[in-house]
Amino acid sequence: MSKQAVLLDEAARQSLYSSCPAWTIASDGLVREWRFHSFVEAFGFMTQVALLAERANHHPEWSNVYNRVTIRLTTHDLGGLSSRDAELAQAIDSLSPTT
């Protein structure tokens, strides 16, 4: 992850449509939902994401209901969508199934 986070300008936000196509771009962050076959599978995914987030020192807002996981990424310190959110979204995508 980059050391210095910067808010994404409009061009960078537009590039997220190709680099993070499964994510919804909100005014101040990125949101994505996954559905798994079971709670255990969902929790395993969350554990992997937690390890990524801890290494990046950038932690998601998330919820889990049975086999469903929803993640929202935003950079509170900067008040919006930043390069750190985009980088973490791409890292999460690298380990997530296409559900």
UniProtKB/Swiss-Prot annotation:
CDD domains named in the record: PCD_DCoH_subfamily_b (cd00914)
Swiss-Prot/TrEMBL catalytic activity: (4aS,6R)-4a-hydroxy-L-erythro-5,6,7,8-tetrahydrobiopterin = (6R)-L-erythro-6,7-dihydrobiopterin + H2O
Keywords of this entry: Lyase
Molecular functions (GO terms): 4-alpha-hydroxytetrahydrobiopterin dehydratase activity
SUPFAM superfamilies: PCD-like
UniProt similarity note: Belongs to the pterin-4-alpha-carbinolamine dehydratase family.
Name of this chain's protein: Putative pterin-4-alpha-carbinolamine dehydratase
